[in-house]
A protein has these predicted regions:
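GAF sensory/regulatory domain recognition
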Residues: 50-86
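Signal-transducing coupling segments at domain and membrane junctions
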Residues: 101-130
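Signal-transmission linkers at sensory-effector interfaces
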Residues: 1-28, 179
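A short, aliphatic-rich beta-strand micro-motif
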Residues: 129-138
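Short glycine-/small-residue motifs
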Residues: 144-145
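Regulatory loop-to-helix N-cap segments in sensory/regulatory domains
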Residues: 150-169, 176-181
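Amphipathic alpha-helical regulatory segments at dimerization interfaces
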Residues: 16, 20, 32-41, 96, ...
Length: 181
């Protein structure tokens, strides 16, 4: 069963990361392990890790995994999410998710009310029909984001157990930052 396999891969990745966090670890290695576990466990098409760029007060794409990521370095570079937007600015879905710090699954990004909230950079460069956003926060402020997508609308289906493991993975990434911070 697909969900059982996903749970096994996620749980095993979490265990590896836990062991890594006990040793003298390199932050980037832990982050890559988190992305790799997500990518393999849930068969995402692409995953991208974004980190706060203090000068710009926005999140920018740092690295990713998946279909075409190497040939599409432009894909990772495309991610630019403002952390503070003027109230009058059009409601950018990514900015809103990061400001609220809420895990968000967009089942069908082609739906009109969703599509009109997707930023121009996303529509031009990324343009996935379904995606998941997992913000990373410390002291109530989002400082990073994990993005994951698939190639068909409504194709990201998560059981409660998978969702719980995803959150654990995200929390491990936050812990890694706290320990190096």
């Amino acid at each position: 069963h697909l969900h059982d396999e996903a749970v096994q891969v996620l749980a095993s990745g979490i265990e590896d990361i836990t062991n890594q966090l006990v040793d003298n670890f390199k932050l980037n290695e832990v982050l890559r392990m988190v992305l790799e576990t997500l990518y393999r466990g849930l068969h995402f098409r692409r995953v991208v890790f974004c980190l706060r760029e203090p000068k710009l007060d926005s999140l920018t794409g740092r690295f990713g995994l998946g279909d075409d990521i190497e040939s599409a370095k432009g894909l990772v570079a495309a991610f630019k999410i403002p952390l503070h937007t003027a109230a009058s600015a059009s409601v950018d879905l990514f900015a809103a998710v990061c400001q609220r710090g809420v895990d968000t699954l967009i089942a069908d990004a082609t739906e009109h009310k969703i599509a009109e909230r997707l930023p121009a950079w996303y529509q031009a460069k990324v343009h996935a029909p379904t995606f998941l956003l997992l913000p990373l926060a410390m002291k109530g402020a989002t400082f990073a984001l994990i993005y994951a997508d698939k190639g068909h609308p409504n194709s990201i289906e998560l059981s409660e157990r998978e969702l719980s493991l995803l959150r654990t993975l995200r929390n491990q990434a936050v812990m890694a930052f706290k320990q190096t911070g």
